[in-house]
UniProtKB/Swiss-Prot annotation:
Gene: PAL
Placement of covalent cross-link 5-imidazolinone (Ala-Gly): 200-202
Official protein name in the record: Phenylalanine ammonia-lyase
Binding locations of (E)-cinnamate: 258, 346, 352, 382, 454, 482, 485
Catalytic machinery residues: 106 (proton donor/acceptor)
């Protein structure tokens, strides 16, 4: 930023985030942050998440850095900018000097909130009382339920609070911030209550427990590096914080508790995952189009360019990239050309309008990400110490509305992604809609003893229902608090918590859906090989039985072969393959129908036994019944042993890295009723990998060749 256009706190580079006079309302900065593609932004987040150090200066913290500190623990170190020390010290000194001069300042010489009319000269005692009365949380120790904030969310809050206080507007000593960073770097996490904050005036109650640990309160506890419970003295020793517990100076207790760090810290974690899940939903939609034999024109750039929404345009371009050159798309095109007037002209909405559905949701998630990144780099306590103007400013930056609103919006977007996923899943397992895949995606030999993903569909309905409930807003449930002083409040942390729940449920859905898509990929592989076997067998039998008459002469039935093979091409394999020669299944019925139709056209020749096609039907069917079941079983066994005649098409597709990860690295396999392994066991593997971030690389590998633009309109 041009230093000539910034107003600082008058105390060095660490004392001010800078205020650009060329963009006084900050809209320019906000717009600049939205440039480029969402995918490139997510790639940048992942890269930053994996860095070994997070350097804090108060101005450049990102959600990926917060997520890294939250979940990677001691793998990532926190470093405080030394240049911020001067500004932090200046604001702390100003508070002490103003106290000594008798200046009346909120929370320094006054009571708090609705009782700020009270006055005291005992500034240190006032801070101690602030922490005591805010320690109002319930942990439920000794009960089955847990009411403790997850350690990851607490670590996120600690990092964000340090970042805010580093900017030098809060009147707190640098040494306290160093102590918090030592707790982070040594993986020592204070125990904070899960509930009890309305995120205005900040997250008072949970943050007071961080202050409680710093001051050595008897009821304060922390969790150590190996999960052990620590009392304050032991926590200080393990963290290497010297000098004993802190005796808070005037304003320092208020500086620690009067901020939005818990809500915005958790929101950062949530959004890091939501952004990745949004990209995953785009790729899963493309794989859905592949296994459903969808028509790829739904991704055509002109369609989306005419709609103007950037999220939609990018979603379509990503799907277009996955489908471009896909072996499934090429094969499906041939199928669509066969009897086109007997098939739907368009795919259903869950496939065809997936870019239009996902696009606005990605825009919402991206916008929320920027809003939360502004919040975690904001100074959000009260009062603010403006050293350069020699005054304390009484305002309301503790109001966490950006968090509540962003999280409500994100949760709605997450729920809508889940709704699309459920609609796609429902089509995938339904043999009325899935273009020839078996009902329930059953992969076994006997569908009467294999119900595939039926239980999974019920679970998906449960997930989706809960997710839709969570989509309801939190921010319209505000209650007037603290003697009507906090009469409007953001409910930021509550909304963040509910969004974290929603993201967790979307991960359950994504895991289940991805395993189902891999099942569908394998079933298409079975389908292709089995159809090839059936065609080969029918062709072989036709040549053997229908070509020659009893005396070696050419027989009229030899002309039936082409139509017989056309039946095999047109009939869904899984409609008959469990018992291919059954008279009640369509294959034998339609093969016979071909022979009957040819016989009816045979005219006078049909009256002659030596040229009658009717006379060939029994021999043809008997030969089919002799050969086909053996050939089908042989083909099944070959596929199961990895020796299929036709390789799996997925290996030729850009979606292959995701399939390969699920099948090879996670060790999942085709689910059938013949095997002991349950669907939930496979879903668990994928869910765990998704939670650990192990799916990020294969997901990004699917898109590594994308140049950030749609294909040209030709």
């Amino acid at each position: 930023m041009d230093s000539t256009t910034a107003i600082g706190n008058g105390v060095g580079s660490g004392g001010s985030p800078g205020f650009c006079l060329k963009d006084p309302l900050n809209w320019g900065v906000a717009a600049e942050a939205m440039k480029g593609s969402h995918l490139e932004e997510v790639k940048g987040m992942v890269e930053e998440f994996r860095k070994p150090v997070v350097r804090l200066g108060g101005e450049t913290l990102t959600i990926s850095q917060v997520a890294a500190i939250a979940v990677r623990g001691s793998e990532v170190a926190v470093e405080l900018s030394e240049s911020a020390r001067e500004g932090v010290k200046a604001s702390s000194d100003w508070v002490m000097e103003s106290m000594n001069k008798g200046t009346d300042s909120y929370g320094v010489t006054t009571g708090f909130g609705a009782t700020s009319h009270r006055r005291t000269k005992e500034g240190g005692a006032l801070q101690k009382e602030l922490i005591r009365f805010l320690n109002a949380g319930i942990f439920g120790n000794g009960t089955e339920s847990c009411h403790t904030l997850p350690q990851s969310a607490t670590r996120a809050a600690m990092l964000v609070r340090i970042n805010t206080l580093l900017q030098g507007y809060s009147g707190i000593r640098f040494e306290i911030l160093e102590a918090i960073s030592k707790f982070l770097n040594n993986n020592i996490t204070p125990c904070l209550p899960l509930r009890g904050t309305i995120t205005a005036s900040g997250d008072l109650v949970p943050l007071s427990y961080i202050a409680g640990l710093l001051t050595g309160r008897h009821n304060s506890k922390a969790v150590g590096p190996t999960g052990e419970i620590l009392h304050p003295k032991e926590a200080f020793r393990l963290a290497g914080v010297e000098g004993g517990f802190f005796e808070l100076q005037p304003k320092e207790g208020l500086a620690l508790v009067n901020g939005t760090a818990v809500g915005s810290g958790l929101a950062s974690m949530v959004l890091f995952e939501a952004n990745i899940l949004a990209v995953l939903s785009e790729v899963l939609s493309a794989i859905f189009a592949e296994v459903m034999q969808g028509k790829p024109e739904f991704t055509d750039h002109l369609t989306h360019k005419l709609k103007h929404h950037p999220g939609q345009i990018e979603a379509a371009a990503i799907m277009e990239h996955i489908l471009d050159g896909s072996s499934y798309v090429k094969a499906a095109q041939k199928l669509h050309e066969m009897d086109p007037l007997q098939k739907p002209k368009q795919d259903r909405y869950a496939l065809r309008t997936s870019p239009q559905w996902l696009g606005p949701l990605i825009e919402v998630i991206r916008s929320s990400t920027k809003s939360i990144e502004r919040e975690i780099n904001s100074v959000n306590d009260n009062p603010l110490i403006n050293v350069s103007r020699n005054k304390a400013l009484h305002g309301g930056n503790f109001q966490g509305t950006p968090i509540g609103v962003s999280m409500d919006n994100t949760r709605l977007a997450v729920a809508s992604i889940g709704k699309l996923m459920f609609a796609q899943f429902s089509e995938l397992v339904n043999d009325f809609y899935n273009n020839g895949l078996p009902s329930n995606l059953s992969g076994g030999r006997n569908p009467s003893l294999d119900y595939g993903f039926k239980g999974a569909e019920i679970a998906m309905a449960a997930y989706c229902s809960e997710l839709q409930f969570l989509a309801n807003p939190v921010t319209n449930h505000v209650q007037s608090a603290e003697q009507h002083n906090q009469d409007v409040n953001s409910l930021g942390l509550i909304s963040s918590r509910k969004t974290a729940e929603a993201v967790d449920i979307l991960k359950l859905m994504s895991s289940t859906y991805l395993v189902a898509l891999c099942q569908a990929v394998d079933l298409r592989h079975f389908e292709e090989n089995l159809r090839n076997t059936v065609k080969s067998t029918v062709s072989q039998v036709a040549k053997r039985v229908l070509t020659m008459g009893v005396n070696g002469e050419l027989h009229p039935s030899r002309f039936c072969e082409k139509d017989l093979l056309r039946v095999v091409d047109r009939e869904y394999i899984f409609a008959y393959i469990d018992d291919p020669c059954s008279a009640t299944y369509p294959l034998m019925q339609k093969l016979r129908q071909v022979l009957v139709e040819h016989a009816l056209k045979n005219g006078e020749s049909e009256k002659n036994l030596s040229t009658s096609i009717f006379q060939k039907i029994r021999a043809f069917e008997e030969e089919i019944k002799t050969l086909l079941p053996k050939e089908v079983e042989s083909t099944r066994a070959a596929i199961e042993n990895g020796n299929s005649a036709i390789p799996n098409r997925i290996k030729e597709c850009r979606s292959y890295p995701l399939y390969k990860f699920v099948r090879e690295e996670l060790g999942t396999e085709l689910l059938t009723g013949e095997k002991v392994r349950s669907p939930g066991e496979e879903f668990d593997k994928v869910f765990t990998a998704l939670c650990k971030g192990e799916m990020i690389d294969p997901l990004m590998d699917c898109l590594k060749e994308w140049n950030g633009a749609p294909l040209p309109i030709c």
